[in-house]
């Protein structure tokens, strides 16, 4: 069993497009998850813009987008 949660929230909505934020939180006492994958499926024709360090990078045109990483709570 893991002690982590993943939540998604829409942070901005302009009608024809929106901005969202994933939050992945380790809820266990002083433990780490060295490998995880979070993903979301999108409808056909959707265009997803990948954001890194606060700026918009290249558009990503695919239906499934995943992010890998490490979560710690120590």
Curated annotation (Swiss-Prot):
- Family statement drawn from the similarity comment of this UniProt entry: Belongs to the glycosyl hydrolase 18 family. Chitinase class II subfamily.
N-terminus of 30 kDa chitinase, as annotated region: 28-52
Q: Would the keyword DNA-binding be found if you checked this record's keyword annotation? A: no
Q: Does the keyword NAD apply?
A: no
* Entry protein name: Chitinases 70, 30, and 20.5 kDa
**What is this enzyme's EC?**
3.2.1.14
Reaction catalysed by this enzyme: Random endo-hydrolysis of N-acetyl-beta-D-glucosaminide (1->4)-beta-linkages in chitin and chitodextrins
Q: Name one GO biological process term.
A: chitin catabolic process
Coiled-coil annotated spans: none
Known role: Able to cleave chitin oligomers from N=3 to 6.
GO MF, one term, reads: endochitinase activity
Subunit annotation: Homodimer, but homotrimers and homotetramers could be observed for the 20.5 and 30 kDa chitinases.
Quote the PTM field.
Answer: The 70 kDa chitinase is probably the precursor protein of the 30 and 20.5 kDa chitinases.
Superkingdom field:
Bacteria
Its ancestry begins with: Bacteria, Bacillati, Actinomycetota, Actinomycetes, Kitasatosporales
Query: Region (N-terminus of 20.5 kDa chitinase): which ranges?
Result: 53-74
Which keywords fit this entry according to its UniProt record? Carbohydrate metabolism, Chitin degradation, Glycosidase, Hydrolase, Polysaccharide degradation
Q: Which organism is it from?
A: Streptomyces olivaceoviridis
Region annotation (N-terminus of 70 kDa chitinase) ranges:
1-27
């Amino acid at each position: 069993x893991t002690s982590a949660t993943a939540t998604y929230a829409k942070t901005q909505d302009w009608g024809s497009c929106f901005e969202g934020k994933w939050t992945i939180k380790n809820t266990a006492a002083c433990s780490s998850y060295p490998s995880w994958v979070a993903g979301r499926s999108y409808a056909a024709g959707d265009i997803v813009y990948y954001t890194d360090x606060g700026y918009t990078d290249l558009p990503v045109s695919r239906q499934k987008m995943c992010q890998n990483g490490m979560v710690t709570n120590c």
